[in-house]
UniProtKB/Swiss-Prot annotation:
Subcellular location: Cytoplasm
Main location: cytoplasm
Family according to the record: Belongs to the YqgF nuclease family.
CDD domains for the chain: YqgF
InterPro entries, per the entry: RNaseH-like_sf, YqgF, YqgF/RNaseH-like_dom, YqgF/RNaseH-like_dom_sf
GO MF annotations, alphabetized: nuclease activity
Keyword vocabulary terms for this entry: Cytoplasm, Hydrolase, Nuclease, Ribosome biogenesis
Record's function text: Could be a nuclease involved in processing of the 5'-end of pre-16S rRNA.
Species for this entry: Aster yellows witches'-broom phytoplasma (strain AYWB)
Pfam families documented for this protein: RuvX (PF03652)
Membrane spanning stretches: none
Stated name of the protein: Putative pre-16S rRNA nuclease
Length: 151
């Protein structure tokens, strides 16, 4: 039997005004958890709600989406993710934070929601947590196939 406490991970999709959050308690499957809305670029507003989630689920690892350009260049959004990673490491030293390529995760999330006939308002409300779930699941699948490469 898996020890859920040791495998609890969060997937995060960081935007300018939203943070999509996904959870895996088993290290096998990701599920969308919630979207936190915050004032534009006020990332410090995310610390208290994340602290609550980290404590509640005894999170050991955070997989933070890393939005590289399609040509692999690092733009401003990736630099913001790098800054946010350092902030998380400083605030939650006991939690490992890993940057993970998130290219096209939001596009994929929107397609999933459209396929399920979600209305525009629901798509805008849910796309980030679905994207976070995709990011986390991609990481979990990679680790399953490459167990010696766990970051």
């Amino acid at each position: 039997m898996l020890n859920c406490q040791n495998n609890a991970s969060l997937g995060l999709d960081l935007g300018e005004k939203t943070l999509g959050i996904a959870l895996s308690q088993t290290g096998i499957i990701a599920q969308n958890l919630k979207t936190i809305f915050f004032d534009t670029h006020k990332y410090d507003q995310l610390i208290a709600p994340l602290q609550k989630i980290i404590s509640q689920y005894q999170i050991k690892k955070i997989i933070l989406g890393y939005p590289k350009h399609m040509n692999n260049d690092i733009g401003i959004k990736a630099k913001i993710s790098n800054y946010f990673k350092k902030t998380l490491e400083n605030k939650f030293g006991q939690v490992k934070v890993i940057l993970w390529d998130e290219r096209l995760s939001t596009v994929q999330a929107i397609q999933i929601l459209k396929t399920n006939n979600k209305k525009k308002g629901k798509i805008l409300q849910m796309k980030d947590e679905i994207a976070a779930s995709i990011i986390l699941q991609n990481y979990l699948d990679y680790i399953k196939l490459h167990p010696n490469k766990e970051n």
